[in-house]
Amino acid sequence: MRDISYLVSNVDKIENEFINDPGSKAAYNIALYDAFCKSLNISLGSFLGRIIPELPTSITVGIKDINETIEEINEYYSSGFRYIKIKLGDKIDYDIERITKINEKFGSNIKIRIDANQGWSIDDTIKFCNKTTGVELIEQPISVDNTQQLLKLPDSVKEIIALDESLVSYEDAIKYSQNNYGKIFNIKLMKCGGITSGRKISNVALLNDVDLMWGCNDESIISISAALNTALSFPNTKYLDLDGSVDLDKDLVSGGFNLKNGVMKPLDKPGLGVELV
């Protein structure tokens, strides 16, 4: 690898490696951006061109019974979170009942996002949309193998469909945006291979009037900070789902961003703005 000041050539070298290992590619890619920005004593956000100062993130409630779901939402609400992502994808009628009960309890005090975990059919998806209210978006209702079926959804439903597992690469982004499989792309740096790949997908979305959601798995503040700074550099970023470091028992670093009342704001420190603990 060349001197860290040669960011583009170093990134290009990594882009051609780890073809089937996007997590490792993302780790190298993020490290290169962090080191490069630190060499210039600027934040990653400044280098990428942050245009959104801060955004709220959703926080996730897993597949649970209705009482447990409401209890957990209450806890998050008390902590300041107003955007709640509910994991569904079991039985459609029970999924509808859960959301109906949540709406009865919380009304407009929270915004609901759904992750159907590839668990529904096209008919289930349409039924859910017809029977529920107050849902901001639905992640990946259909299995990856049946992604083509999303084209059968009414345009009104496609407006709130977020492609997740189906969206891995730049080529996927071109296909799904030009043919309107859904009007939201959920980008995860560990899924696509890092900041560079994430930006390529984002630019395709921007050119095709597709909104962006930025997600994660259970991850360190390191990669969450990378995703946050990348997200806030695109005007079509509308949704954050970057709660992956919240429940970690222990992290390798601290810093990166402030999280207050569910709103994420990057720290203006060199690189990712993180420090070893």
Spans of features found by a protein language model:
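Active-site beta->alpha loop and helix N-cap motifs at the rims of alpha/beta catalytic domains
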Residues: 42, 59-71, 75, 92, ...
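Catalytic domains of carbohydrate-active enzymes, especially glycoside hydrolases
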Residues: 76-87
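Active-site mouth loops of central-metabolism enzymes
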Residues: 54-68, 117, 121, 162
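Flexible C-terminal active-site loop/helix
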Residues: 217-277
